């Protein structure tokens, strides 16, 4: 799968993924049904994005990238009591990170503070094109920008890009509140909407029983008066709603006179206290798509039953064509994970994790902090594909994509997680050798580095057994192993403490067995990693694992009972000295152990330096191995 795409050029058909939605888009492109393909990613800013959102981001931005289109980032912010600027900022950062270098030239954003009223003369021109014009006039986009994208290549990677990014912001459904209100008034005037005085519980009961509201046949004049007074703040929350007048007996409950406006006396993160009536999702969604010129509105399957309402609202407002159309695909359900915002919020609020970006969380910020790359997430989304059928995706599919990606990019390093001291008695005291070690065997251009070797080294406790099991090929009394990049050593003596625990091994080395030596080709069955004791750098290593112990933790009962008590273990490791120069988010393979990343909690190059590393993933699927035993 190619990740490079010339700015402004669609991806060749033979290089595009194929699924039922892309097939529809390809047909529309061939028919020239729309001037340009225009998708959107519209999260509600009431929580952090998770890996399920990553699938949708990859689909919507992927289609824009492949067909030379645009994908708007829009905040679906119609519920003031649950939304916050914190979530807007995290969502924007996560989206930019995930599409960086892949589809960032397709990112639809707008000049900060601009709305349709301030950009266009009539409130219904192509908002996106107007935004591009404003950016060019402001110097945010160059005049010869070859793409019609309203974003620059605005990432977190450089001062110029940061400056441009600071002058852009997502689209907001709340920017359209004036227009949405006028659309609601238009429905009232056509006899297609009415103000209802039923309580929320009564409304639910009436709709369930296909029963007509006693307020359904109010006059247009009365409805207009009441709706105006609702807007003016004359009524308390929950006392009145505006409902679409469709069919109370419809077999589709979403068409049974659905609510399209409700009263909420609450401060809004974007509009302040200007409004006390707010549109419902189904009303704002389709009209926001229309205002922005969206062609393909792609949702998950639970919104399939909402599509008739989406179409009804657009058609009954007599809007100029073309109209957007909604398409649905199966959402991501991932094994050993929960993705309900409510349940993730419980984990955070009950301090069962350290926060939204805890590396065990399925949030994009958590996954990123764990060391997973955007490329790995996009590869995962590509591998699972797009279907119409819900099903559980094995987490091993995600883990395979992560390992495959990191194997190619991660620098190799020697680190001992649980050290035991080894003294090589026939190696000269005070001597240090610089040995050559490969940085990445998958990448010849990564070159080599020097690692120090001395008389005393650390090895893993698990690499020594006083009484070894069958087929144990690592170090044991009288046994030999090769220290990677160094010598073959033989265990001659054990040193134990007062409790009888082995605390030191005394070994001799075959000093001719190093590369280039007379016995370098001598074979032994085991090769282990090590770190020179006198040169080791201490690090806090956080060994993260799956957060839950079962594939479907929320299938029944309290999901928290399936939390993995061993999902985090913290050890003080001994690292080769090159890691003291590491920077946050650099990724490594600790040889024979797994993939690790420098955590943002690290205090680097300070007087009280502290190196902290997170385990991204083990080298092999240890869960599959355990499952085979049961």
Task: Describe these PLM feature segments.
Residues 3-4, 8-10, 109-167, 602-610:
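Intrinsic disorder/low-complexity segments
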Residues 14-26, 30-93, 268-300:
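N-terminal catalytic cores of NTP/NDP-binding nucleotidyl/phosphoryl-transfer enzymes
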Residues 30-33, 62-70, 94-107, 190, ...:
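Secondary-structure transition/capping motifs at alpha-helix termini
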Residues 42-46, 74-84, 110-112, 168-178, ...:
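Conserved short loop/turn motifs at secondary-structure junctions
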Residues 79, 85, 114-121, 125-131, ...:
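Active-site cores that bind ATP or allylic diphosphates and position pyrophosphate for catalysis
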Residues 88-123, 168-174, 184:
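A glycine-rich helix N-cap at a beta->alpha junction
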Residues 303, 307, 311-313, 375-378, ...:
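Core subunits and conserved enzymes of cellular information-processing
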Residues 322-401:
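Long, charged, mostly alpha-helical binding arms that flank functional sites
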């Amino acid at each position: 799968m190619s990740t490079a795409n010339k700015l402004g050029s669609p991806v060749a058909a033979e290089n595009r993924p194929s699924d039922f939605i892309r097939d529809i888009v390809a047909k529309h492109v061939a028919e020239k049904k729309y001037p340009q393909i225009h998708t959107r990613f519209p999260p509600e800013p009431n929580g952090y994005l998770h890996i399920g959102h990553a699938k949708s981001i990859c689909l919507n931005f992927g289609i824009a990238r492949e067909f030379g289109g645009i994908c708007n980032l829009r905040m679906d912010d119609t519920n003031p009591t649950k939304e916050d600027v914190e979530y807007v900022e995290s969502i924007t950062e996560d989206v930019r990170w995930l599409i960086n270098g892949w589809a960032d030239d397709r990112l639809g954003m707008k000049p900060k503070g601009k709305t349709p009223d301030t950009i266009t003369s009539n409130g219904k021109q192509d908002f996106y094109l107007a935004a591009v014009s404003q950016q060019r006039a402001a110097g945010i986009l160059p005049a010869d920008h070859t793409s019609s994208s309203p974003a620059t290549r605005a990432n977190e990677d450089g001062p110029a890009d940061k400056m441009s990014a600071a002058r852009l912001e997502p689209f907001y459904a709340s920017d359209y509140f004036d227009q949405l209100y006028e659309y609601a008034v238009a429905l009232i005037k056509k006899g297609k909407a009415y103000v209802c005085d039923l309580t929320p519980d009564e409304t639910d009961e009436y709709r369930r029983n296909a029963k007509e509201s006693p307020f359904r046949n109010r006059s247009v004049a009365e409805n207009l008066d009441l709706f105006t007074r609702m807007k003016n703040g004359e009524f308390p929350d929950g006392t009145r709603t505006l409902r679409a007048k469709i069919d109370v007996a419809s077999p589709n409950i979403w068409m049974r006179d659905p609510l399209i406006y409700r009263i909420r006396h609450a401060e809004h993160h974007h509009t302040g206290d200007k409004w006390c009536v707010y549109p419902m999702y189904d009303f704002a969604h389709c009209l926001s798509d229309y205002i922005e010129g969206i062609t393909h509105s792609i949702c998950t399957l639970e919104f399939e039953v909402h599509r008739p309402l989406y179409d009804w609202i657009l058609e009954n407002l007599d809007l100029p064509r073309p109209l957007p159309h909604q398409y649905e695909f199966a959402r991501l359900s991932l094994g050993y994970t929960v993705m309900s915002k409510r349940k993730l919020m419980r984990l955070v609020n009950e301090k069962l994790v350290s926060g939204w970006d805890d590396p065990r969380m399925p949030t994009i910020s958590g996954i990123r902090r764990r060391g997973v790359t955007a490329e790995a997430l996009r590869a995962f989304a590509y591998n699972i594909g797009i279907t119409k059928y819900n099903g559980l995706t094995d987490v091993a599919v995600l883990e395979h994509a992560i390992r495959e990606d990191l194997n190619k990019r991660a620098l190799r390093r020697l680190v001992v997680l649980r050290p035991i001291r080894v003294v090589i008695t026939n190696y000269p005291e005070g001597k240090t050798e610089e040995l050559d070690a490969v940085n990445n065997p998958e990448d010849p251009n990564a070159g080599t580095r020097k690692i120090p070797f001395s008389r005393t080294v650390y090895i893993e406790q698990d690499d020594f057994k006083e009484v070894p099991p069958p087929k144990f090929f690592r170090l044991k009394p009288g046994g030999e192993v090769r220290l990677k990049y160094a010598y073959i050593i033989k265990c001659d003596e054990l040193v134990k403490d007062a409790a009888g625990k082995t605390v030191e091994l005394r070994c001799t080395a075959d000093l001719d067995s190093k590369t280039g030596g007379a016995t370098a080709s001598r074979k032994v069955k085991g090769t282990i990693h090590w770190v020179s004791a006198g040169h080791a750098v201490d690090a806090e290593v956080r060994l993260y694992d799956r957060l839950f112990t079962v594939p479907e933790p929320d299938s029944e009962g309290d999901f928290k009972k399936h939390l993995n008590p061993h999902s985090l273990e913290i050890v003080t490791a001994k690292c080769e000295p090159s890691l003291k120069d590491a920077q946050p988010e650099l990724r490594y393979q600790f040889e024979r152990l797994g993939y690790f990343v420098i955590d943002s909690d690290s205090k680097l190059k300070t007087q009280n330096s502290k190196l902290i590393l997170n385990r991204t993933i083990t080298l092999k699927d240890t869960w599959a191995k355990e499952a085979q035993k049961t």
